[in-house]
Amino acid sequence: MNAYVFCNKELLPDYLDWCRDSGYSWNVLIWKKPTAIPIGDSHRPDIEYLLLFRKNAIWNNGTDANYSRCLIYDRVKKSEDNGNHPTIKPIELIANEIKISSNINSIVVDFFGGSGSTLIACEQLNRTCYMCELDPHYVDVIVNRWEAFTGQTAELITE
């Protein structure tokens, strides 16, 4: 199993302690945002941590993925298409990690669906995505993005 978690520097020690205590291998990746906007801190918020936890994991060596620990992708600007979500992740970044840690037809789970970047990346890479999002607004954003990307109509299953 591979698990990825985006977090800030304050949560890093807690996640890494949990990982060691639970017997997971881990790696710390950095999402470098070249277009970060200064927000009054002593340094620009131009990185975000992406933690990788793994146990009995799949690795895909030899793909066209970027295996660097420093992943450079511009931040995604808020827009109506992504529901003005405050922490949109670039589809290319998510797709890169999915390529590394899964195979075609694998199942990818995202417990924090947000604007749906993981779902779109899975569609591009022929993976099955199971996603959870509690905020009805962002559920609609995810469905709309998926429908626009695939040209299909989502079906509500109530059972």
Regions found by a protein language model. Name each.
Residues 1-131, 139:
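Core catalytic lobe of class I
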Residues 143-159:
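S-adenosyl-L-methionine
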Residues 135:
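Conserved SAM/SAH-binding beta-strand->alpha-helix loop
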